[in-house]
C-alpha cells in the first residue's frame, strides 16, 4: 500500500469522502435511536434513576428525556458534521499530507461512535435480559458525577485499545480514534469533578 499504511480499508476510505460520510450518517443516526431505545427501556424497567438526565451530552438531554423520535438539533449536527468530513477531505487533499491527515480525522469521527455503540449494545443487552427474566430487585440511583466517571473510564479503555491497533497496524485511522476517545474521556472526567461539587438536581427515571 502507498504512504506507509497497510490497511486496504484505509486506502478505500481515502479515495473519496463518500464512504466516510455514509458510515458517519449511519452511525450518528443509529447512535441517537439507540439512546432513545435504551432511555425508554430503563424507564420502563423502573429499577434505574439517573440524576439530571440519562443522556450525558448536554445539548441532547432535553430531547432524550422527552424521548423525541426526531431531534432537530441532531439533524442539524448530522448535516454539519457530514459537510465537515467532506471539507476535511478536500482540504487535506489540497494543502496537507494526504491521505494520512484525512484518515486521522475520519477516525476521530467514526471510532468514537464505534465506542459509543459498544456501550449502547451493552445497555440494550441488559434491558433485554431483565425483560426476559428479571434478575434485579430494588432501585439503583446513578449520581451524575458517577455516570460521567464511568463514561470516562470506558472512553479511556477504548482509547488504549485503538492506540494499540494504531501502533500494530501503523494506522492513522485508529490513531485518530484513540485521540478522540481520550479527549472525550478527559472531558467527562472534568465534568465528573464539576458535577460532584455541584448541588444535587432533580432525578430522572431515565
Predicted regions and their residues:
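Hydrophobic alpha-helical segments at protein termini of multi-pass membrane proteins
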Residues: 2-206
Amino acid at each position: 500500500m502507498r504512504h506507509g499504511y497497510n490497511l486496504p480499508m484505509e486506502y478505500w476510505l481515502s479515495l473519496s469522502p463518500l464512504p466516510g460520510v455514509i458510515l458517519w450518517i449511519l452511525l450518528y443516526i443509529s447512535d441517537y435511536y439507540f439512546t432513545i431505545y435504551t432511555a425508554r427501556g430503563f424507564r420502563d424497567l423502573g429499577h434505574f434513576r439517573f440524576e439530571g438526565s440519562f443522556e450525558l451530552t448536554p445539548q441532547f438531554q432535553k430531547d432524550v428525556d422527552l424521548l423525541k423520535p426526531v431531534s432537530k438539533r441532531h439533524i442539524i449536527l448530522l448535516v454539519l458534521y457530514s459537510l465537515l468530513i467532506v471539507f476535511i477531505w478536500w482540504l487535506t487533499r489540497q494543502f496537507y499530507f494526504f491521505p494520512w491527515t484525512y484518515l486521522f480525522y475520519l477516525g476521530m469521527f467514526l471510532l468514537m461512535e464505534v465506542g459509543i455503540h459498544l456501550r449502547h449494545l451493552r445497555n440494550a443487552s441488559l434491558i433485554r435480559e431483565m425483560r426476559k427474566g428479571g434478575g434485579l430487585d430494588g432501585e439503583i440511583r446513578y449520581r451524575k458525577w458517577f455516570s460521567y466517571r464511568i463514561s470516562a473510564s470506558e472512553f479511556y479503555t477504548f482509547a488504549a485499545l485503538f492506540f494499540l491497533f494504531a501502533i500494530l497496524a501503523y494506522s492513522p485511522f485508529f490513531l485518530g480514534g484513540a485521540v478522540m476517545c481520550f479527549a472525550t474521556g478527559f472531558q467527562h472526567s472534568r465534568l465528573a469533578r464539576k458535577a460532584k461539587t455541584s448541588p444535587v438536581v432533580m432525578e430522572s427515571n431515565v
